[in-house]
């Protein structure tokens, strides 16, 4: 199981980076796309959604950075790697879903990068151990 720790951290870092990229794509989009004569980013709901995403990404980055530091020092547990993999891949799914929503119907078309990001996000919750397996490992680590 310990040999899977690096794999799960690689997945966590990749998922978080992909979520951050989706956020940046969407931030640019909501600043440029207009509706009713205003950038869609100027609407309260868009600002709230972007603020929520930015906050969750910041928290995720802090956790992943902490896990990386522990891994480099040989202190990262199987459970912590599972937490990082589970949390970041679920976060990626949530972020890409919200970002696609902010793109509206355009986000679902192949002409926009967010569409591909949304599709690609799904597999991260499967490879390297499913979300359910990560939760199982965390539960076992608590002695349950």
Q: Language-model segments: what does each one mean?
A:
Residues 2-144:
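Alpha-helical interface subdomain recognition
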């Amino acid at each position: 199981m310990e040999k899977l720790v690096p794999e799960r951290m690689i997945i966590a870092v990749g998922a978080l980076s992909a979520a951050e990229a989706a956020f940046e794509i969407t931030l640019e989009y909501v600043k440029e796309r207009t509706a009713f004569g205003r950038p869609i980013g100027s609407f309260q709901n868009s600002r709230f959604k972007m603020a929520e995403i930015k906050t969750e990404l910041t928290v995720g980055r802090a956790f992943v950075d902490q896990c990386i530091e522990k891994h480099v020092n040989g202190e990262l547990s199987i459970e912590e790697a599972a937490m990082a993999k589970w949390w970041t891949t679920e976060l990626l799914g949530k972020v890409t879903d919200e970002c696609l929503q902010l793109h509206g119907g355009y986000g679902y078309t192949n002409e926009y990068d967010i569409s591909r990001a949304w599709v690609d996000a799904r597999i991260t919750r499967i490879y390297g151990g499913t979300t359910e397996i990560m939760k199982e490992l965390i539960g076992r680590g608590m002695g349950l």
